[in-house]
Design a protein with these regions (language model features):
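Conserved catalytic alpha/beta core of Sir2/sirtuin-type deacylases, generalized to analogous enzyme cores
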Residues: 2-325
Length: 325
């Protein structure tokens, strides 16, 4: 097991023990009682830390995509209506995830919805917060860790710089995990969308099936069933683990963006542990709802409460202005 996966396993056990605390929007970790710096000073400190860092690890979660308009997962937003309107009108869905959990009466309509869901993320443009983040990271040695499955990061960076530890909407797996393989999902999704047209169902012959056992395919993502934790899964963890091992003695900046209360064990709490254990590590989080800075790293981090898109834009501008000072 790689070092980062081991950290995740450790924090998952903590999450299970204190589930009710996390489910109510809290954390089981004792938080700092220090008063946060004013926003403008936080941005200046952020800029300074980026400039001084010898390497950076960015942990990008759902709040990052939501800040750029990818906010259709949990609620009935304009973007949800834009992409899923025909299903919302027919079934009364109030967010994309509610449709993914729905038991459709036919597999044809189930796959019509899945294809719509995957097509929405596969073909989404690179969202503005990601572009601002890219400008902030220019000239730096960095690695991306993400729980997002929406392919935003791999539209900007080469695969070797991104660890997608929760899966990727570009791939299918066998729903029965009969083989340790993943297959392309982009072309099958495009074919289903074309065949579906204005309707909500795809024809039988386009329902994706495993070439080995004949079972239906399944999106290679955690959250809906038998997530294949095989070779590709381990490769994603190996990338981030090797980066940490290679840079553990350098001045490393850990940036956490948009972690919610459902998945603190994949980015947030491992970042806290790394900040504490690595001598020259520093931690910065940005979140629109939670301002969590553990007491045990209160002198090695800051937590910024604010819209992630706004913070990244302000940070980019401040970084660019500082280059001319």
């Amino acid at each position: 097991m790689s070092c980062y996966e081991n950290l995740v396993m450790k924090t998952q056990m903590n999450y299970s023990r204190h589930y009710s605390t996390y489910a109510s929007g809290g954390t089981a970790v004792v938080l700092s009682k220090q008063k946060p710096l004013p926003y403008e000073e936080q941005i200046q400190e952020f800029v300074r830390r980026v400039q001084e860092a010898e390497c950076i690890i960015v942990g990008g979660a759902s709040g990052l995509s939501a800040a750029g308009g990818g906010d259709f997962y949990y609620s009935d937003t304009p973007s949800f209506r834009e992409h899923f309107g025909k299903f919302a009108d027919k079934y009364g869905f109030k967010g994309a995830f509610s449709g993914m959990m729905h038991r459709f009466s036919t597999r044809n309509e189930h796959w019509g919805y899945v294809a719509t869901f995957l097509n929405t993320t596969q073909n989404a443009p690179i969202r503005e917060p990601y572009l601002d983040l890219d400008r902030i990271l220019q000239g730096k040695d960095f690695h991306i860790l993400t729980t997002n499955q929406d392919t935003q990061f791999v539209k900007i960076y080469p695969e070797e710089k991104v660890s997608e530890i929760q899966g990727d909407h570009r791939f299918f797996q066998c729903s029965q995990c009969c083989q340790d393989e993943t297959w392309d999902a982009v072309q099958p999704v495009a074919d289903m969308i074309a065949a579906m047209g204005e309707g909500t169902m795809v024809p039988d012959e386009l329902i994706p099936r495993c070439p080995h056992c004949g079972a239906e395919m399944f999106s290679w993502v955690r959250g809906y069933g038998n997530f294949l934790q095989g070779k590709k899964y381990e490769e994603e963890y190996e990338k981030i683990s090797k980066y940490i091992q290679k840079n553990k003695d350098r001045k490393i900046l850990l940036i956490e963006l948009g972690v919610g209360r459902m998945t603190p064990m994949f980015i947030q709490e491992p970042f806290w542990e790394l900040t504490n254990s690595l001598k020259d590590a520093y931690y910065i989080s940005v979140n629109s709802e939670y301002q969590f800075l553990p007491e045990f790293i209160e002198d090695k981090g800051i937590a910024i409460l604010g819209d992630i898109g706004t913070v990244l834009k302000d940070l980019r501008k401040a970084k660019e202005e500082s280059a001319f000072v």
